[in-house]
């Protein structure tokens, strides 16, 4: 965790124009291992498609973090997501990583709340930093910048492998119809 920031900071000092993760003006950092940029996509299955091809080339030391923002609605949603990943990808390791907050007065709060929505006092936001959860305020500057840039996966609007295949099949049929290889159903019925 500290290396991703420390090396990027040293590289930026030595080579001011070097490309690091994040955006112009951000605190420099590198993503861990060969992860996608943290703001690459909201579609978890698009990210999995890319990472599956890459992470299966390694013999160890890889993990796909499914940063979810708030927790999933229930255990069935989590089980369904895990099943889809297990049945459609060869990734050796993956995590479901929701963000949560803790208020000294009101306890556990789902999602990111720097201020408690119940009592209005300061709350601690916890998220996964590599392999474990820690309060975001205790992270180094580079990891905090990574957290700020992080796009969480939108599970509801992500296109599962099954949905992608259906879309592909429908598009293929339309292309065949347009090429005159197959008559449209309405014309065939007439």
Spans of features found by a protein language model:
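Long, C-terminal-biased catalytic regions of enzyme "large/alpha" subunits
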Residues: 1-190
């Amino acid at each position: 965790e500290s290396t991703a920031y420390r090396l990027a900071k040293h590289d930026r000092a030595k080579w001011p124009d070097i490309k690091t993760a994040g955006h112009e003006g951000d605190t420099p950092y590198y993503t861990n291992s060969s992860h996608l940029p943290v703001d690459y996509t909201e579609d978890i299955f698009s990210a999995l498609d890319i990472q599956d091809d890459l992470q299966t080339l390694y013999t160890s030391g890889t993990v796909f973090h499914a940063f979810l923002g708030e927790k999933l609605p229930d255990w069935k949603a989590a089980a369904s997501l895990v099943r889809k990943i297990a049945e459609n990808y060869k990734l050796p390791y993956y995590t479901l990583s929701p963000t949560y907050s803790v208020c000294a007065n009101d306890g556990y709060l789902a999602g990111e709340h720097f201020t408690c929505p119940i009592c209005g006092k300061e709350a601690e936001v916890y998220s996964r930093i590599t392999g474990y959860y820690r309060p975001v305020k205790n992270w180094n500057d580079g990891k905090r910048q990574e957290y700020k840039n992080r796009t969480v996966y939108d599970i509801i609007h992500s296109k599962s492998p099954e949905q992608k295949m259906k879309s592909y099949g429908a598009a293929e049929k339309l292309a065949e119809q347009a090429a005159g290889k197959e008559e449209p159903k309405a014309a065939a019925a007439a």
